[in-house]
């Protein structure tokens, strides 16, 4: 019985180390600290951290595109997940990837009530609408994109809804995309709010937040904030 207990403890320790390793290879943003904004760059509009949320607050109207600053082109395969909620009708809200500039990026988002994969290449915009996925505002939803080379698996609320390939943009950072129409009055958290933004993939270094999660016995990041 004693040996069985030792084997159990050993297996538990190994499993814990594996969880720690997997957790460490990720950029994690819980937006609980205001200085996390310094790791992001606004390409259009203005994003702010308010009440532990990443919020699109620009009142000028138009797109709000923000990306992680210190992104390396060799990080080509990765998975992005984030919680998000739209706070206004007739707006955009979601995530962006392969972000090079305001005229060149991909996004997985709601736009005017429809869930879409949108490409911006050389300033030209092409929409691919996901049928049958209605927009729900002011409730937390989950976006996920699994990026492998030029193939993108697009998930929403845990379900794979579409797999697409696109060759135009081979590199670029990851971030957020939203849109607020000019003159629209928004609340304290703006047109959209995001939380628990996570990018995990080969070569991506651990962030400070993932180190903190190690001290919490490798509880998964999704379970840290509910």
Model-identified regions with their sequence ranges:
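Extracellular beta-strand elements of beta-rich domains used
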Residues: 31, 195-199
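Bacterial N-terminal signal peptides
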Residues: 9-20
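Short carbohydrate-recognition loop motifs
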Residues: 45-64
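Secretory/extracellular carbohydrate-interaction modules
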Residues: 59-123
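Extracellular carbohydrate-recognition regions
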Residues: 23-44, 208-223
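Flexible glycan-contacting loops in extracellular carbohydrate-active proteins
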Residues: 164-195
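Short, aromatic/His-centered strand-loop micro-motif at the edge of beta-sheets
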Residues: 121-144
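Short tryptophan-centered beta-strand motifs in secreted/extracellular beta-sheet-rich domains
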Residues: 31, 80-82, 138-156
